[in-house]
Curated annotation (Swiss-Prot):
It comes from the Bacteria. Belongs to the acetokinase family. Gene3D superfamilies: 3.30.420.40. The lineage of its organism: Bacteria, Bacillati, Mycoplasmatota, Mollicutes, Acholeplasmatales. This is Acetate kinase. The keyword Nucleotide-binding applies. The record marks H177, R236 as: Transition state stabilizer. Pathway: Metabolic intermediate biosynthesis; acetyl-CoA biosynthesis; acetyl-CoA from acetate: step 1/2. It comes from Aster yellows witches'-broom phytoplasma (strain AYWB).
Length: 410
């Protein structure tokens, strides 16, 4: 069964076409700079990689070009071969505690959550509608970043603000990276052969968050109402005193929205180092002895260690610490700096194994009291797996209904 995993941004569209349940990637496609006459389409199969520059005014055109390209390149012979499409949606609010089949009702519910994710949900919705127009009969599913964290208890997701803010405006912690956490959790349960494993996962890419997992469920996570909360990231500040927003607004003669934009886009690595938001640039500058680069990295590592220590206490000990996503999977320096600061817990790094990049590996010594792993995440596969699961559920329900009808009519 061919299933498509879609991840859309305001000016980008990324997807994979997978053969399921074999988990085979047929093609990966990335559309960048949508909305311009210099949009870039990159298509990668097992055998080759093609790149084109095209005029693409909107997502609808992008989707049509993408699907036409699949046929022209003979990746598929007809659109009907695509039996399912899974769309990454950033915010599911409290409405969705699982991925959902896309219907008029569920799409309207997703649209109602745009206030909670004004930068992301509208772009997700545009992409969904574009695919529905081109593939109107195809089974389509929304897979939310937030659903994995809906298992958090109120004491962990509520803020100590006026309670009516939550009742009236749904102000609470929602978290992010849930699809990644779900995938990594399932991988770790298999590795440890333990369904009730207690795990702390560090998802470190340009966006960075942590999650405490107990028996396959999220107990707490570092990102909050938006992805701005938590640890410093590539361009995000992470936690700060909220009063800073008003203070800087007055001192710099900026609107609150502009200050929040600075916290989202001009802070973190970029803000402190003054160099870049890219970890590779920061690490290169650290090697050269750049003190601001060192400081930006140290601040991030310190805050990550704070969360790990807090979650260790919350879970009353852990079976494993896991690093995933771009930085977590590929930076041995990043991992070693964190693990060294956790030595008080008895965790011991195997320096040789820690050299691994982008591959699954146990990176602690045999006598380490806590196991630490590198586990590559695969959000596209996780999305496809959810589409397959919901499609099979629908098929099984149809068969059950038919059987009941047969028995009743007979």
């Amino acid at each position: 069964m061919k299933i498509m995993s879609v991840n859309s941004g305001s000016s980008s569209l990324k997807f994979q076409l997978l053969e399921m349940p074999q988990q085979e990637v047929i093609v990966s496609v990335l559309f960048e700079r949508i909305g311009s006459n210099q949009a870039v389409l990159t298509m990668k199969t097992k055998d080759k990689k093609d790149k084109q520059v095209l005029e693409v005014p909107n997502h609808q055109t992008a989707v049509e070009l993408l699907l036409d390209a699949l046929i022209q390149k003979k990746v598929i012979n007809a659109l009907e071969e695509i039996e399912g499409v899974g769309h990454r949606v950033v915010q599911g609010g409290e409405i969705f505690s699982d991925s959902a089949v896309l219907t008029e009702k569920t799409l309207a519910q997703i649209e109602s959550l745009c206030d909670l994710a004004p930068l992301h949900n509208p772009a997700n919705i545009i992409s969904i509608k574009a695919f529905q127009k081109v593939l109107p009969q195809t089974f389509q599913v929304a897979v939310f970043d937030t659903t994995f964290h809906q298992s958090m208890p109120a004491v962990n997701f509520l803020y100590a603000t006026p309670y009516y803010w939550y009742q009236k405006y749904q102000i609470r912690k929602y978290g992010a990276h849930g699809t990644s956490y779900k995938y990594v959790t399932e991988q770790m349960q298999q590795i440890l052969a333990k369904d009730n494993a207690k795990i702390i996962i560090c998802h470190a890419g340009n966006g960075v968050s942590l999650c405490a997992v107990d028996s396959g469920k999220s107990v707490d996570t570092s990102m909050g109402f938006t992805p701005l909360e938590g640890v410093p990231m590539g361009t995000r500040s992470g936690n700060i005193d909220p009063a800073v927003v008003k203070f800087i607004s007055e001192k710099e003669n900026k609107t609150v929205a502009c200050v929040i934009d600075d916290l989202n886009k001009k802070s973190g690595y970029l803000g402190v180092s003054g160099i870049s938001n890219d970890t590779r640039d920061i690490l290169a500058s650290i090697k050269e002895g750049n003190q601001q680069a060192i400081l930006s990295h140290d601040i991030q590592v310190k805050r990550i260690v704070d969360y790990i220590a807090s979650y260790y206490v919350l879970l009353k000990g852990i079976d494993a610490l896991v690093f995933t996503a771009g930085i977590g999977e590929n930076s041995s320096f990043f991992r070693s700096e964190i693990i060294k600061r956790l030595s008080v817990l008895g965790i011991k790094l195997d320096e040789e194994k820690n050299k691994v990049k982008g591959k699954q590996e146990l990176i602690t010594t045999p006598d380490s009291t806590i196991k630490a792993f590198v586990i590559p995440t695969n959000e596209e596969l996780a999305i496809a797996q959810d589409v397959l699961r919901l499609k099979q559920n629908k098929t099984n329900q149809y068969k059950d209904d038919q059987q009941e009808c047969f028995c009743f009519c007979g």
